[in-house]
Amino acid sequence: MAEIRVGKNETLDSALRRFKRSCQKAGVLAEARKHEYYEKPSVKRKKKSEAARKRKSFR
């Protein structure tokens, strides 16, 4: 989990923006969405294969 320390003269808005940015960099929301529901191993492999195929076609 992302953690920030609020400075003495820092507003709550700027602290919240920093927290959201650190969560985004850490990938907290993406990880939560990925584990939102169970995904069978065969489906995981299929998605991984499709992603690799898509990356390869861009080259």
From Swiss-Prot:
GO terms for molecular function: structural constituent of ribosome. PROSITE patterns: RIBOSOMAL_S21. Residues 43-59 have a biased composition (Basic residues). Residues 40-59 are annotated as: Disordered. One of its GO terms (cellular component) is ribosome. Keywords: Ribonucleoprotein, Ribosomal protein. InterPro entries: Ribosomal_bS21 (IPR001911), Ribosomal_bS21_CS (IPR018278), Ribosomal_bS21_sf (IPR038380). GO terms for biological process: translation. It comes from the Bacteria. Belongs to the bacterial ribosomal protein bS21 family. This is Small ribosomal subunit protein bS21. It comes from Desulforamulus reducens (strain ATCC BAA-1160 / DSM 100696 / MI-1) (Desulfotomaculum reducens). The gene is rpsU.
